[in-house]
Protein backbone atom coordinates (compact mmCIF):
# COMPACT_ATOMS: atom_id res chain seq x y z
CA UNK A 1 0.00 0.00 0.00
CA UNK A 2 1.50 3.30 -1.08
CA UNK A 3 0.48 6.79 0.02
CA UNK A 4 -1.96 7.14 -2.87
CA UNK A 5 -3.86 4.01 -1.91
CA UNK A 6 -3.58 4.89 1.76
CA UNK A 7 -5.40 8.17 1.12
CA UNK A 8 -8.25 6.30 -0.58
CA UNK A 9 -8.46 3.46 1.91
CA UNK A 10 -8.12 5.81 4.85
CA UNK A 11 -11.15 7.79 3.71
CA UNK A 12 -13.05 4.54 3.24
CA UNK A 13 -12.14 3.43 6.76
CA UNK A 14 -13.26 6.76 8.23
CA UNK A 15 -16.59 6.28 6.46
CA UNK A 16 -16.83 2.70 7.76
CA UNK A 17 -16.12 3.81 11.33
CA UNK A 18 -18.62 6.67 11.15
CA UNK A 19 -21.28 4.36 9.69
CA UNK A 20 -20.55 1.75 12.35
CA UNK A 21 -20.93 4.21 15.21
CA UNK A 22 -23.96 5.92 13.66
CA UNK A 23 -25.66 2.55 13.27
CA UNK A 24 -24.40 0.82 16.40
CA UNK A 25 -27.79 1.12 18.09
CA UNK A 26 -29.20 -1.31 15.53
CA UNK A 27 -26.70 -4.06 16.35
CA UNK A 28 -27.25 -6.57 19.17
CA UNK A 29 -25.17 -5.21 22.02
CA UNK A 30 -23.83 -8.67 22.93
CA UNK A 31 -22.61 -11.18 20.32
CA UNK A 32 -24.41 -14.44 19.61
CA UNK A 33 -21.36 -16.67 19.25
CA UNK A 34 -19.85 -19.62 21.08
CA UNK A 35 -16.24 -19.94 22.29
CA UNK A 36 -13.96 -20.82 19.39
CA UNK A 37 -16.30 -19.43 16.72
CA UNK A 38 -13.56 -17.46 14.96
CA UNK A 39 -11.03 -20.25 14.45
CA UNK A 40 -13.41 -22.01 12.07
CA UNK A 41 -13.73 -18.88 9.94
CA UNK A 42 -10.08 -18.15 9.20
CA UNK A 43 -7.20 -20.21 7.78
CA UNK A 44 -4.86 -22.01 10.14
CA UNK A 45 -1.79 -20.26 8.67
CA UNK A 46 -0.96 -16.79 7.36
CA UNK A 47 -1.25 -16.29 3.58
CA UNK A 48 1.90 -16.78 1.51
CA UNK A 49 0.84 -14.15 -1.02
CA UNK A 50 -0.68 -10.71 -0.37
CA UNK A 51 -4.44 -10.47 -0.17
CA UNK A 52 -6.52 -7.51 -1.29
CA UNK A 53 -7.78 -4.79 0.98
CA UNK A 54 -11.30 -5.48 -0.30
CA UNK A 55 -11.07 -9.06 0.99
CA UNK A 56 -9.99 -7.85 4.42
CA UNK A 57 -12.80 -5.31 4.66
CA UNK A 58 -15.39 -7.93 3.69
CA UNK A 59 -14.06 -10.18 6.44
CA UNK A 60 -14.57 -7.49 9.07
CA UNK A 61 -18.35 -7.82 8.81
CA UNK A 62 -18.19 -11.55 8.14
CA UNK A 63 -15.72 -12.60 10.84
CA UNK A 64 -15.00 -9.81 13.31
CA UNK A 65 -18.25 -7.94 13.90
CA UNK A 66 -20.31 -11.06 14.75
CA UNK A 67 -18.01 -11.57 17.76
CA UNK A 68 -17.83 -7.97 18.97
CA UNK A 69 -19.42 -6.79 22.20
CA UNK A 70 -20.45 -3.25 21.29
CA UNK A 71 -19.15 -1.24 24.22
CA UNK A 72 -20.25 2.03 22.64
CA UNK A 73 -23.84 0.99 22.06
CA UNK A 74 -26.34 3.16 23.97
CA UNK A 75 -27.68 -0.15 25.33
CA UNK A 76 -24.37 -1.15 26.89
CA UNK A 77 -24.71 -0.67 30.66
CA UNK A 78 -22.04 -3.11 31.87
CA UNK A 79 -18.77 -2.61 33.76
CA UNK A 80 -17.85 1.09 33.55
CA UNK A 81 -17.58 3.34 30.49
CA UNK A 82 -14.71 3.03 28.07
CA UNK A 83 -14.21 6.43 26.52
CA UNK A 84 -14.53 7.13 22.83
CA UNK A 85 -14.65 10.31 20.78
CA UNK A 86 -13.83 11.34 17.24
CA UNK A 87 -11.07 13.77 18.30
CA UNK A 88 -9.33 10.97 20.21
CA UNK A 89 -9.62 8.63 17.22
CA UNK A 90 -8.02 11.23 14.97
CA UNK A 91 -5.22 11.72 17.48
CA UNK A 92 -4.67 7.96 17.59
CA UNK A 93 -4.26 7.97 13.81
CA UNK A 94 -1.59 10.64 14.09
CA UNK A 95 0.07 8.76 16.96
CA UNK A 96 0.30 5.68 14.78
CA UNK A 97 1.70 7.69 11.90
CA UNK A 98 4.41 9.38 13.96
CA UNK A 99 5.17 5.99 15.50
CA UNK A 100 7.72 7.15 18.05
CA UNK A 101 8.72 5.13 21.11
CA UNK A 102 8.92 7.90 23.68
CA UNK A 103 11.02 6.33 26.41
CA UNK A 104 13.18 9.44 26.79
CA UNK A 105 13.12 13.12 25.96
CA UNK A 106 15.68 12.57 23.21
CA UNK A 107 13.63 9.74 21.68
CA UNK A 108 10.90 12.29 20.93
CA UNK A 109 10.95 15.67 22.67
CA UNK A 110 7.38 16.55 21.70
CA UNK A 111 6.07 13.22 23.02
CA UNK A 112 7.66 13.83 26.41
CA UNK A 113 6.92 17.52 26.77
CA UNK A 114 3.29 17.37 25.63
CA UNK A 115 2.62 14.62 28.17
CA UNK A 116 4.06 16.74 30.97
CA UNK A 117 1.96 19.74 29.96
CA UNK A 118 -1.24 17.71 29.44
CA UNK A 119 -0.88 16.11 32.85
CA UNK A 120 -0.53 19.58 34.36
CA UNK A 121 -3.61 20.74 32.42
CA UNK A 122 -5.59 17.80 33.75
CA UNK A 123 -4.24 18.23 37.27
CA UNK A 124 -5.42 21.84 37.27
CA UNK A 125 -8.85 20.76 36.00
CA UNK A 126 -9.03 18.51 39.09
CA UNK A 127 -7.68 21.26 41.35
CA UNK A 128 -4.89 18.99 42.53
CA UNK A 129 -2.46 20.47 45.05
CA UNK A 130 0.50 22.22 43.44
CA UNK A 131 2.81 19.51 44.77
CA UNK A 132 1.42 17.06 42.19
CA UNK A 133 2.16 19.32 39.22
CA UNK A 134 5.37 19.45 37.25
CA UNK A 135 5.24 23.17 36.49
CA UNK A 136 8.61 24.38 35.33
CA UNK A 137 10.69 22.87 38.11
CA UNK A 138 8.32 21.00 40.43
CA UNK A 139 9.27 17.95 42.47
CA UNK A 140 6.07 16.16 41.47
CA UNK A 141 4.37 15.58 38.17
CA UNK A 142 2.14 13.37 36.10
CA UNK A 143 2.67 10.41 33.82
CA UNK A 144 0.36 8.40 31.55
CA UNK A 145 0.26 4.73 32.49
CA UNK A 146 -1.47 1.98 30.55
CA UNK A 147 -4.10 1.24 33.19
CA UNK A 148 -5.03 1.84 36.82
CA UNK A 149 -3.71 -1.65 37.55
CA UNK A 150 -0.33 -0.57 36.22
CA UNK A 151 -0.42 2.65 38.25
CA UNK A 152 -1.15 0.74 41.45
CA UNK A 153 1.74 -1.63 40.77
CA UNK A 154 4.11 1.26 40.03
CA UNK A 155 3.11 3.00 43.26
CA UNK A 156 3.48 -0.20 45.31
CA UNK A 157 6.92 -0.99 43.91
CA UNK A 158 8.09 2.59 44.48
CA UNK A 159 6.75 2.53 48.05
CA UNK A 160 8.42 -0.83 48.67
CA UNK A 161 11.79 0.44 47.45
CA UNK A 162 11.48 3.64 49.48
CA UNK A 163 10.63 1.81 52.71
CA UNK A 164 13.39 -0.78 52.30
CA UNK A 165 16.00 1.92 51.69
CA UNK A 166 14.84 3.86 54.74
CA UNK A 167 15.04 0.77 56.95
CA UNK A 168 18.43 -0.27 55.59
CA UNK A 169 19.77 3.25 56.11
CA UNK A 170 18.90 2.91 59.80
CA UNK A 171 19.95 -0.76 60.05
CA UNK A 172 22.41 -1.68 57.27
CA UNK A 173 22.59 -5.29 58.44
CA UNK A 174 18.97 -5.92 57.36
CA UNK A 175 18.68 -7.69 54.02
CA UNK A 176 16.05 -6.91 51.43
CA UNK A 177 14.77 -10.48 51.60
CA UNK A 178 14.28 -10.28 55.36
CA UNK A 179 12.45 -6.97 55.10
CA UNK A 180 10.23 -8.14 52.25
CA UNK A 181 8.81 -10.85 54.48
CA UNK A 182 7.64 -8.20 56.96
CA UNK A 183 6.22 -5.59 54.59
CA UNK A 184 2.43 -5.35 54.51
CA UNK A 185 0.02 -3.23 52.47
CA UNK A 186 -3.65 -2.44 53.09
CA UNK A 187 -6.77 -1.71 51.11
CA UNK A 188 -10.54 -1.96 51.49
CA UNK A 189 -12.37 -5.25 51.07
CA UNK A 190 -14.17 -3.45 48.23
CA UNK A 191 -10.98 -2.57 46.33
CA UNK A 192 -10.32 -3.70 42.79
CA UNK A 193 -8.60 -7.06 42.35
CA UNK A 194 -5.65 -5.28 40.74
CA UNK A 195 -4.48 -4.20 44.21
CA UNK A 196 -4.20 -7.83 45.26
CA UNK A 197 -2.42 -8.59 42.00
CA UNK A 198 0.06 -5.76 42.63
CA UNK A 199 0.91 -7.36 45.96
CA UNK A 200 1.34 -10.72 44.27
CA UNK A 201 3.74 -9.27 41.69
CA UNK A 202 5.52 -7.16 44.29
CA UNK A 203 5.98 -10.08 46.67
CA UNK A 204 4.32 -8.39 49.64
CA UNK A 205 1.32 -9.13 51.83
CA UNK A 206 -1.95 -7.33 51.05
CA UNK A 207 -4.56 -7.15 53.80
CA UNK A 208 -8.22 -6.28 53.21
CA UNK A 209 -9.71 -3.83 55.71
CA UNK A 210 -13.41 -4.50 56.44
CA UNK A 211 -15.56 -1.70 55.05
CA UNK A 212 -18.45 -0.09 56.92
CA UNK A 213 -22.15 -0.18 56.11
CA UNK A 214 -21.59 2.18 53.19
CA UNK A 215 -18.79 -0.02 51.80
CA UNK A 216 -16.20 2.55 52.85
CA UNK A 217 -12.82 2.01 54.54
CA UNK A 218 -12.74 4.00 57.77
CA UNK A 219 -9.98 5.15 60.09
CA UNK A 220 -10.80 2.93 63.07
CA UNK A 221 -10.62 -0.31 61.09
CA UNK A 222 -7.35 0.70 59.42
CA UNK A 223 -5.81 1.84 62.70
CA UNK A 224 -6.70 -1.45 64.35
CA UNK A 225 -5.02 -3.43 61.57
CA UNK A 226 -1.91 -1.26 61.64
CA UNK A 227 -1.48 -1.59 65.39
CA UNK A 228 -2.08 -5.33 65.34
CA UNK A 229 0.46 -5.90 62.58
CA UNK A 230 3.11 -3.65 64.11
CA UNK A 231 2.74 -5.54 67.38
CA UNK A 232 3.34 -8.75 65.42
CA UNK A 233 6.58 -7.36 63.99
CA UNK A 234 5.24 -6.51 60.55
CA UNK A 235 6.03 -3.28 58.72
CA UNK A 236 3.11 -1.33 57.19
CA UNK A 237 4.30 0.55 54.10
CA UNK A 238 1.44 1.09 51.63
CA UNK A 239 -2.29 1.89 51.69
CA UNK A 240 -4.63 2.08 48.71
CA UNK A 241 -7.72 4.25 49.09
CA UNK A 242 -10.43 3.66 46.49
CA UNK A 243 -12.63 6.53 45.38
CA UNK A 244 -15.44 4.95 43.37
CA UNK A 245 -15.22 1.19 43.85
CA UNK A 246 -15.87 -1.11 40.91
CA UNK A 247 -18.65 -3.01 42.65
CA UNK A 248 -20.85 -0.12 43.78
CA UNK A 249 -18.96 3.19 43.36
CA UNK A 250 -18.44 3.62 47.10
CA UNK A 251 -15.79 5.95 48.49
CA UNK A 252 -13.23 5.21 51.18
CA UNK A 253 -12.99 7.94 53.80
CA UNK A 254 -9.90 9.74 52.56
CA UNK A 255 -10.14 12.54 55.12
CA UNK A 256 -9.94 9.96 57.93
CA UNK A 257 -7.43 7.55 56.39
CA UNK A 258 -5.05 10.15 54.95
CA UNK A 259 -3.77 11.61 58.24
CA UNK A 260 -3.15 8.13 59.64
CA UNK A 261 -0.96 7.24 56.67
CA UNK A 262 1.02 10.44 57.05
CA UNK A 263 1.46 9.89 60.79
CA UNK A 264 2.66 6.32 60.23
CA UNK A 265 4.98 7.17 57.33
CA UNK A 266 2.98 4.90 55.05
CA UNK A 267 2.68 5.60 51.30
CA UNK A 268 -0.91 6.55 50.43
CA UNK A 269 -2.09 5.78 46.89
CA UNK A 270 -5.52 6.86 45.61
CA UNK A 271 -7.26 4.72 42.99
CA UNK A 272 -10.09 6.72 41.41
CA UNK A 273 -10.06 4.87 38.10
CA UNK A 274 -13.71 5.55 37.23
CA UNK A 275 -14.81 8.35 39.53
CA UNK A 276 -11.80 10.59 38.99
CA UNK A 277 -13.17 12.07 35.77
CA UNK A 278 -16.13 13.51 37.69
CA UNK A 279 -13.80 15.55 39.89
CA UNK A 280 -13.46 18.12 37.09
CA UNK A 281 -17.01 19.18 38.01
CA UNK A 282 -17.06 21.53 41.02
CA UNK A 283 -20.10 19.77 42.51
CA UNK A 284 -18.17 16.48 42.67
CA UNK A 285 -14.75 17.84 43.67
CA UNK A 286 -15.57 17.30 47.36
CA UNK A 287 -15.18 13.57 46.74
CA UNK A 288 -11.43 14.19 46.33
CA UNK A 289 -11.06 16.17 49.55
CA UNK A 290 -8.01 14.85 51.39
CA UNK A 291 -5.92 14.28 48.26
CA UNK A 292 -3.27 16.45 49.88
CA UNK A 293 -2.44 13.50 52.16
CA UNK A 294 -1.64 11.21 49.21
CA UNK A 295 1.74 10.33 47.76
CA UNK A 296 0.23 9.24 44.45
CA UNK A 297 -3.13 9.60 42.71
CA UNK A 298 -4.54 7.86 39.66
CA UNK A 299 -7.65 7.85 37.49
CA UNK A 300 -8.53 6.78 33.95
CA UNK A 301 -9.45 9.43 31.38
CA UNK A 302 -10.00 6.43 29.11
CA UNK A 303 -13.04 5.52 31.19
CA UNK A 304 -15.12 8.68 31.35
CA UNK A 305 -13.26 11.62 29.84
CA UNK A 306 -13.65 10.88 26.11
CA UNK A 307 -10.00 9.85 25.65
CA UNK A 308 -9.83 6.43 24.00
CA UNK A 309 -8.02 3.55 25.71
CA UNK A 310 -5.29 3.49 26.84
CA UNK A 311 -4.75 6.59 28.97
CA UNK A 312 -4.42 6.23 32.74
CA UNK A 313 -3.35 9.42 34.50
CA UNK A 314 -1.02 9.13 37.50
CA UNK A 315 0.51 11.89 39.62
CA UNK A 316 3.16 11.74 42.33
CA UNK A 317 4.30 14.36 44.81
CA UNK A 318 7.95 13.36 44.50
CA UNK A 319 9.11 12.15 41.12
CA UNK A 320 12.32 10.87 42.68
CA UNK A 321 10.26 8.20 44.46
CA UNK A 322 9.63 6.69 41.02
CA UNK A 323 12.94 7.42 39.33
CA UNK A 324 14.95 5.96 42.21
CA UNK A 325 12.87 2.78 42.09
CA UNK A 326 12.92 2.24 38.31
CA UNK A 327 16.09 3.93 37.08
CA UNK A 328 17.98 1.83 34.54
CA UNK A 329 20.53 3.68 32.46
CA UNK A 330 22.30 1.58 29.82
CA UNK A 331 24.62 3.50 27.53
CA UNK A 332 22.40 3.03 24.48
CA UNK A 333 19.59 4.99 26.18
CA UNK A 334 21.72 7.86 27.45
CA UNK A 335 21.56 11.31 25.87
CA UNK A 336 23.22 14.67 26.32
CA UNK A 337 20.34 16.37 28.18
CA UNK A 338 19.47 13.69 30.72
CA UNK A 339 21.49 15.21 33.57
CA UNK A 340 20.57 18.81 32.78
CA UNK A 341 17.64 18.93 35.19
CA UNK A 342 15.54 20.39 32.38
CA UNK A 343 13.87 17.26 31.01
CA UNK A 344 11.89 14.18 32.01
CA UNK A 345 12.71 10.65 30.89
CA UNK A 346 9.46 8.77 31.40
CA UNK A 347 11.11 5.37 31.13
CA UNK A 348 12.02 5.84 34.80
CA UNK A 349 8.35 6.36 35.75
CA UNK A 350 6.89 3.08 34.51
CA UNK A 351 7.25 -0.70 34.14
CA UNK A 352 7.90 -0.99 30.37
CA UNK A 353 10.53 0.86 28.38
CA UNK A 354 8.50 1.84 25.32
CA UNK A 355 5.57 4.22 25.36
CA UNK A 356 3.19 5.62 22.76
CA UNK A 357 2.43 9.28 22.06
CA UNK A 358 -0.75 9.05 24.15
CA UNK A 359 -0.85 12.69 25.17
CA UNK A 360 -1.95 13.60 21.65
CA UNK A 361 -5.37 12.15 22.48
CA UNK A 362 -5.64 14.34 25.56
CA UNK A 363 -4.54 17.43 23.61
CA UNK A 364 -7.12 16.87 20.87
CA UNK A 365 -9.97 16.08 23.28
CA UNK A 366 -9.28 18.88 25.75
CA UNK A 367 -9.07 21.45 22.97
CA UNK A 368 -12.07 20.27 20.94
CA UNK A 369 -14.42 19.77 23.92
CA UNK A 370 -13.08 22.31 26.36
CA UNK A 371 -13.50 21.90 30.10
CA UNK A 372 -17.14 22.95 29.87
CA UNK A 373 -17.88 20.32 27.24
CA UNK A 374 -16.28 17.59 29.34
CA UNK A 375 -18.19 18.72 32.42
CA UNK A 376 -21.46 18.66 30.47
CA UNK A 377 -20.73 15.10 29.36
CA UNK A 378 -20.15 13.92 32.95
CA UNK A 379 -23.27 15.71 34.20
CA UNK A 380 -25.41 14.14 31.48
CA UNK A 381 -24.38 10.64 32.54
CA UNK A 382 -25.01 11.39 36.21
CA UNK A 383 -28.43 12.81 35.37
CA UNK A 384 -29.32 9.66 33.42
CA UNK A 385 -28.24 7.42 36.30
CA UNK A 386 -30.54 9.31 38.66
CA UNK A 387 -33.32 8.97 36.11
CA UNK A 388 -32.85 5.20 36.15
CA UNK A 389 -32.70 5.23 39.95
CA UNK A 390 -36.04 7.04 40.02
CA UNK A 391 -37.61 4.46 37.71
CA UNK A 392 -36.40 1.61 39.91
CA UNK A 393 -37.71 3.25 43.08
CA UNK A 394 -41.17 3.56 41.51
CA UNK A 395 -41.43 -0.23 41.24
CA UNK A 396 -41.98 -1.79 44.70
CA UNK A 397 -40.62 -5.14 43.49
CA UNK A 398 -37.10 -3.67 43.30
CA UNK A 399 -34.67 -2.09 45.74
CA UNK A 400 -31.74 0.31 45.35
CA UNK A 401 -28.74 -1.18 47.15
CA UNK A 402 -26.33 1.77 47.53
CA UNK A 403 -26.38 5.53 47.30
CA UNK A 404 -26.29 6.73 43.69
CA UNK A 405 -23.57 9.37 43.47
CA UNK A 406 -22.24 9.24 39.91
CA UNK A 407 -23.17 7.12 36.90
CA UNK A 408 -23.75 3.72 38.51
CA UNK A 409 -26.97 2.33 39.96
CA UNK A 410 -26.87 -0.89 42.00
CA UNK A 411 -30.30 -2.52 42.22
CA UNK A 412 -32.01 -5.88 42.58
CA UNK A 413 -35.35 -7.60 42.85
CA UNK A 414 -36.45 -7.97 46.45
CA UNK A 415 -36.00 -11.64 47.12
CA UNK A 416 -33.41 -14.36 46.76
CA UNK A 417 -30.06 -14.23 45.04
CA UNK A 418 -31.24 -16.99 42.71
CA UNK A 419 -34.11 -14.79 41.59
CA UNK A 420 -31.70 -12.02 40.64
CA UNK A 421 -29.26 -14.38 38.97
CA UNK A 422 -32.12 -15.67 36.83
CA UNK A 423 -33.17 -12.12 35.95
CA UNK A 424 -29.65 -11.19 34.88
CA UNK A 425 -29.36 -14.34 32.80
CA UNK A 426 -32.61 -13.46 31.03
CA UNK A 427 -31.46 -9.89 30.43
CA UNK A 428 -28.16 -10.85 28.85
CA UNK A 429 -29.59 -13.77 26.90
CA UNK A 430 -32.04 -11.42 25.21
CA UNK A 431 -29.06 -9.31 24.03
CA UNK A 432 -31.06 -6.08 23.91
CA UNK A 433 -29.06 -4.55 26.75
CA UNK A 434 -25.97 -5.71 28.61
CA UNK A 435 -25.44 -5.67 32.38
CA UNK A 436 -23.00 -7.31 34.79
CA UNK A 437 -23.48 -8.07 38.49
CA UNK A 438 -21.62 -7.51 41.72
CA UNK A 439 -21.88 -9.04 45.16
CA UNK A 440 -22.42 -6.74 48.13
CA UNK A 441 -21.89 -8.70 51.32
CA UNK A 442 -24.19 -11.68 50.77
CA UNK A 443 -26.42 -10.10 48.11
CA UNK A 444 -26.28 -10.70 44.35
CA UNK A 445 -26.77 -7.24 42.83
CA UNK A 446 -27.29 -5.92 39.30
CA UNK A 447 -25.20 -2.96 38.15
CA UNK A 448 -26.59 -0.37 35.71
CA UNK A 449 -23.71 1.84 34.54
CA UNK A 450 -24.35 4.70 32.12
CA UNK A 451 -21.60 4.16 29.57
CA UNK A 452 -22.15 5.25 25.97
CA UNK A 453 -21.29 8.68 24.60
CA UNK A 454 -24.58 8.57 22.67
CA UNK A 455 -26.91 7.27 25.39
CA UNK A 456 -30.04 9.36 25.94
CA UNK A 457 -33.06 9.29 28.23
CA UNK A 458 -34.99 7.25 25.65
CA UNK A 459 -32.41 4.45 25.87
CA UNK A 460 -32.60 4.41 29.66
CA UNK A 461 -36.40 4.29 29.51
CA UNK A 462 -36.37 1.41 27.02
CA UNK A 463 -33.78 -0.46 29.08
CA UNK A 464 -35.93 -0.14 32.19
CA UNK A 465 -39.06 -1.31 30.37
CA UNK A 466 -37.12 -4.34 29.16
CA UNK A 467 -35.82 -5.13 32.65
CA UNK A 468 -39.26 -4.68 34.17
CA UNK A 469 -40.90 -6.98 31.60
CA UNK A 470 -38.31 -9.69 32.15
CA UNK A 471 -38.70 -9.32 35.90
CA UNK A 472 -42.43 -9.92 35.56
CA UNK A 473 -41.71 -13.09 33.59
CA UNK A 474 -39.21 -14.32 36.18
CA UNK A 475 -41.57 -13.64 39.07
CA UNK A 476 -44.45 -15.42 37.32
CA UNK A 477 -42.25 -18.45 36.70
CA UNK A 478 -41.25 -18.52 40.37
CA UNK A 479 -44.89 -18.68 41.47
CA UNK A 480 -45.78 -21.51 39.09
UniProtKB/Swiss-Prot annotation:
Coiled coil segments of this chain: none
Effect in UniProt of substituting residue 192 to Q: Reduces decarboxylase activity by 96%
EC primary class: lyase
Keywords: Acetylation, Catecholamine biosynthesis, Decarboxylase, Lyase, Pyridoxal phosphate, Repeat
UniProt cross-references to InterPro entries, sorted A to Z: Aromatic_deC, PyrdxlP-dep_de-COase, PyrdxlP-dep_Trfase, PyrdxlP-dep_Trfase_major, PyrdxlP-dep_Trfase_small, Pyridoxal-P_BS
Residues with N-acetylmethionine modification: 1
CDD domains cross-referenced by the UniProt entry: DOPA_deC_like
Annotated Sequence repeat ranges: 58-115, 118-178
Pathway this chain belongs to: Catecholamine biosynthesis; dopamine biosynthesis; dopamine from L-tyrosine: step 2/2
N6-(pyridoxal phosphate)lysine carried by residues: 303
GO cellular component: axon; cytoplasm; neuronal cell body; synaptic vesicle
Phenotype upon changing residue 192 to A: Abolishes decarboxylase activity
Binding site for pyridoxal 5'-phosphate: 148-149, 246, 300
Catalysed reaction, written as an equation: L-dopa + H(+) = dopamine + CO2; 5-hydroxy-L-tryptophan + H(+) = serotonin + CO2
Consequence the record notes for mutating residue 332 to A/F: Abolishes decarboxylase activity
Annotated segments matching region 2 X approximate tandem repeats: 58-178
Cited SUPFAM superfamilies: PLP-dependent transferases
PROSITE patterns: DDC_GAD_HDC_YDC (PS00392)
GO BP term, example: isoquinoline alkaloid metabolic process
Family statement: Belongs to the group II decarboxylase family.
PANTHER family: AROMATIC-L-AMINO-ACID DECARBOXYLASE, GROUP II PYRIDOXAL-5-PHOSPHATE DECARBOXYLASE
Quaternary assembly: Homodimer.
Full protein name: Aromatic-L-amino-acid decarboxylase
Amino acid sequence: MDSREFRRRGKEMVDYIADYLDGIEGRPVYPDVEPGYLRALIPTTAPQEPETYEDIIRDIEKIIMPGVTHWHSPYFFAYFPTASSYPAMLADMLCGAIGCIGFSWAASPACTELETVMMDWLGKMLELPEAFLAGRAGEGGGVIQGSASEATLVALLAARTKMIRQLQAASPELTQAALMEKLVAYTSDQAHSSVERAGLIGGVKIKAIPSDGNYSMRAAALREALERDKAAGLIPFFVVVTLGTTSCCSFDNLLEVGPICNQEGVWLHIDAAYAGSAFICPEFRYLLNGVEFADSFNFNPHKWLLVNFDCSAMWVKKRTDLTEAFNMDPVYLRHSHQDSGLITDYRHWQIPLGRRFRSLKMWFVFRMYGVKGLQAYIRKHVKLSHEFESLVRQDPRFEICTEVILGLVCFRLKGSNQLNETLLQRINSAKKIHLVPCRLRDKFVLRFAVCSRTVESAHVQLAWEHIRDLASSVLRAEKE
